Structures are given as structure tokens and as C-alpha cells.
Design a protein with these regions (language model features):
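N-terminal secretory-pathway/extracellular module detecting exported/lumenal segments
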Residues: 27-109, 113-207
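General helical secondary-structure elements
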Residues: 4-5, 21, 172, 191
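Bacterial N-terminal signal peptides
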Residues: 13-22
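Bacterial N-terminal signal peptides that target proteins for export
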Residues: 2-14
Length: 207
């Protein structure tokens, strides 16, 4: 499944959430975010970081095979007033349109995490209003190289949390992904599951 298709599907989820969050300002937005959809990771002085655990999945290659090294995930950031002012100030300095930015509350970013390359590409960035409607959209906004980020970097902590979640919920991601497992990956997963079951059995015998 491509990143664009995922963005379209998640757009429908944001629209549904907008009905629930209508009129909610950023100060209260975190309390209103549906916890069964969004996984909270961290909050800084400027924003809260979430990812959509109902839509996180693996990408598929050109042959329709699931690529276990590439994760597609929609993310959500909730801004505080200082971050809102910072975003607006930067847009004003760059002479970009400001229509709708009086109601800025956060941003949606669609990530493609390439585990083999060690990169995270933001395939799209959307600034959101208080009803989670899109104010503006930027394609292929930026790319991060994980190795170049400090372990204390909040972005790296966010990305690592998503990667860890994906590893712990691999079966869920596979079922959700739009593709089929290659025979090689199916064999590797079967071996991993057999090894895990063996270790679990050994632990049960000798706690």
C-alpha cells in the first residue's frame, strides 16, 4: 500500500475526529484525542507527539509483497501557544499565506520509516486547525537520518518509539498491510516464532 493511499484513508479518520473535537483548542486537545486510535509517545514544552496505531503498517514493493523493512505511519502533533506563534512567525518571515493560521492547533505528518536505510521521510506535512481540518499541505517535507540524530533528540525518541511498537506488534501490522508476505519472509517469521515459543517454554519450566 502506498503512502498516498494511506494519507487518503487517514484523512477520513481525521475528519471523523474533527466532529468529536469541534471547538476544542490546543490546550485541551490532548485530552480529547481518542486513545484507542492514537498512541501517545511524549510531550515536550512545545508539543505532544502521537502516532496512529490503527493505521500503522508495512509498505509493499512493486510486486505487491510486504516489505518488513519499511513502515508507513500517520502521526499527530498537538501544539501549545508558543509553538503556534513560532509556526506563524516563520510563515510570516517566509512570506507564506497565513489564512486559517489564527486557528492553528497542530500538525499531521505521514512517515515512511526505512529500517534498512536508517531514514525517516516525511512524505506529507499538514498544518491542522482546532477541528483537525487541513490548513495547508506540503509534500515530501523533509528526511531524517537516524544515525545523525542524538539519542536525546525528541524526534529520534519519537521515531524509535514507533519502531519499537511496530516490532512488538508485527503480526498486527502484517494483517493490516496491503500486500502478501514473500516465501522468504514467511520462513524467517516462522523460525522466529518457533524460537520464541521454545524460549517461552524453557522459561515456564525454569522460572
Amino acid at each position: 500500500m502506498g503512502a498516498i493511499d494511506l494519507q487518503k484513508r487517514w484523512g477520513a479518520v481525521l475528519a471523523a475526529c474533527a466532529v468529536l473535537l469541534m471547538g476544542v483548542r490546543s490546550a485541551d486537545a490532548a485530552e480529547a484525542i481518542p486513545k484507542h486510535i492514537y498512541e501517545w509517545v511524549q510531550s515536550t514544552a512545545r508539543q505532544g507527539y502521537y502516532f496512529n496505531k490503527e493505521y500503522i503498517q508495512y509498505a509493499a514493493d512493486a510486486h505487491g509483497c510486504i516489505d518488513l523493512t519499511k513502515i508507513l505511519v500517520p502521526t499527530l502533533r498537538v501544539y501549545d501557544n508558543i509553538q503556534i506563534q513560532d509556526v506563524v512567525s516563520k510563515r510570516r518571515w517566509r512570506m507564506l499565506p497565513l489564512e486559517g493560521y489564527g486557528d492553528l492547533s497542530g500538525a499531521a505528518e505521514y512517515l515512511l520509516i526505512d529500517l534498512r536505510a536508517g531514514t525517516v521521510r516525511v512524505t506529507a506535512h499538514e498544518d491542522l486547525d482546532s477541528a483537525w481540518g487541513t490548513i495547508s499541505r506540503e509534500e515530501n517535507a523533509k528526511e531524517f537520518t537516524l544515525a545523525s540524530l542524538s539519542d536525546k533528540d525528541v524526534e529520534k525518541k519519537f521515531f524509535n518509539a514507533i519502531i519499537s511498537y511496530a516490532a512488538a506488534h508485527q503480526e498486527e501490522l502484517i494483517r493490516r498491510s496491503k500486500g502478501i508476505l514473500s516465501d522468504a519472509d514467511r520462513k524467517i517469521l516462522a523460525e522466529q516464532q518457533a524460537k520464541a515459543a521454545k524460549e517461552q517454554k524453557k522459561t515456564a519450566k525454569h522460572p
